[in-house]
Amino acid sequence: EVKPNYDYLKPITLIHTNNVLEAMKVTIEKRKKELESPRSLCLFINRTDMILQVIEKLGLKKDSVVFCSSNSTTKLNEAGIKAVENWNIKEQKPFMFFTSRFYAALDIELKVQPDIMFVTEPYLYEYTIIDPCTDAVQAIGRFRNGVSSTTHIVSTNKDFPIRDEKGINEYIKASEEAYNTILRLYDCAPSLEFRNAYKAALDQLPFK
């Protein structure tokens, strides 16, 4: 187990809610009133379907850009939302959305320290769950000039499984085995439709 030998803790405002969208709306409106000078709000939401819903329902389309995988940019662009595959400061907008591929291995340098918002909605989008010990630390660390504030808006699901370290390791191992099994079937598929079916299954698995 790797443990840092320095203090890496960052202050985070935690907002627990049973209505994530409403909490985001209230928080964004409050921020707008309190903002003395313009700076971007960077939102980390690991599901493009949810990002699309948030942008449309909160009326943020003209002021937003989404940084996501190439598989998702087409869908978002067709919906009239600016979406790009790679980070570029020229794409900076008041609201910048990031999926998990931007949590690590990337330097984001902005002249003005942005506000950060993590969003977790396990009821509808399980993969939006943020790990405070890894995801949050890595994402905040992307901003080389620092951040102004960090907020985590989170809904909880009482039915979500709670695992100890042994359970986590077993789950990861089983997920990897399931992925590799379907991948072998995909590689040996006898027809295009078989490949499409296996590919759809691979895309739904938690292990990549």
Language-model segments: which ranges?
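Conserved strand-helix element at the start of the C-terminal RecA-like helicase core
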Residues: 24-59
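Conserved helicase motor
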Residues: 46-49, 65-83, 99-103
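Conserved helicase ATPase motor motifs in RecA-like P-loop NTPase domains
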Residues: 1-2, 155-157
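Conserved SF2 helicase motif VI
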Residues: 123-149
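Loop/turn-to-beta-strand initiation segments
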Residues: 40, 91-96
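The feature captures the C-terminal accessory region of ATP-dependent helicases
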Residues: 168-208
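SF2 helicase motor core recognition
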Residues: 94-116, 136-146
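Interdomain hinge/linker at the junction between the two RecA-like core domains of SF2 helicases
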Residues: 1-31
